[in-house]
Amino acid sequence: MTTNPAHTALWPAPLASGAVDATVQVPGSKSVTNRALVLAALAAEPGWLRRPLRSRDTLLMAAALREMGVGIEEGVGPDGSGEAWRVIPSGLQGPVTVDVGNAGTVMRFLPPVATLADGPIRFDGDPRSYERPLHGVIDALRALGARIDDRDFGSPGALPLTVHGGGALEGGPVEIDASSSSQFVSALLLSGPRFNQGVEVRHTGSALPSMPHIRMTVDMLRAVGAQVDTPESGGEPNVWRVTPGALLGRDITIEPDLSNAQPFLAAALITGGKVTIPDWPEHTTQPGDALRDIFTQMGGRCELTERGLEFTGSGSIHGIDVDLSEVGELTPGIAAVAALADSPSTLRGVAHLRLHETDRLAALTKEINELGGDVTETSDGLHIRPRKLHGGIFHTYDDHRMATAGAIIGLAVKDVQIENVATTAKTLPDFPDMWAAMLGTDRA
């Protein structure tokens, strides 16, 4: 686990004074925005992204693509309403250096894109990014014919690295172990239509985490004209094939980020109140959609109406035994709610969270326990026994979901202070203001 950072700014997490009753407009999905940016950059014609998420991760992706030669114009949409980005594909060029920050989508999705550039593209990022695995993408690209230097600056299979683009990549079949991150599969699929032979990705490792994100990638590829064969469409298990061909420039509206709705739905559950999330899609591949079922099991009630998702807490919070392997990013928020429940919880299937922005399992265990909790790490998750909690400093380790988990606990526990709440800007800009507005208070 990354050491507690030495931030001095502490944010007093607001204590809920009663049941919340709010409508919260959640910004666009990071996962959808960054996939849409890559696909638009690789298209044969310009396209539009409506209601994109403007956050650190998405701005890093846009800046990286601009560095490589893609035109991205920020303004309003073709109909004159709402923010929209016009993406104008162009020949990708090096030499340039790309800052990935600590964004998994940027550090994993863009090396395959860089193989199509003329010239070297160097990738670097935050110190924590050096610890995150990239070997799946690097090894696969080498097997497909790419030249990559990842040994001159740091550890092999990690940042920093340089992709020596040759203007094209042969592509074809490749085997990878993506058990540590489904983004390895998505990264190859997104650029696959531009490879000379397309790409056939065969996963050879243990169970794949976060399968909804792969389904999201496949659906978005098909929406821009790519032909994709998948296990779900009658193909071989653990094999995805993308046929080479031109991608279409589309006018895409970005769904709200359902995972970022989690703290607000949790507030309704904890306070016995009601929160409405407008524009919740009826059908979606986003992992956050699982919150409807999970938080219902934990004591809430939800209804999808024309206004959006209406979620109501019952005043009781129940423990849960749940496999989160497909929706691991929801673990911090669920753990925070579970720490306030009336019975124990077991969260399973999330060993891969040890490789996320921080070691989320170790971080959650340490921070909840330091507030008086009783959390034990298991081989693939957490066991949480509710205890009476007390105030204290909740460290975030520069992890946005740790920050929102601390805010959730702070609703019911007095004097919780969040270290570096600004890290929420990674995917949820203005979180402190949104939180205060939901509670009907001035920003703390």
Spans of model-derived segments:
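Structural preference for solvent-exposed beta-strand-turn elements
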Residues: 1-444
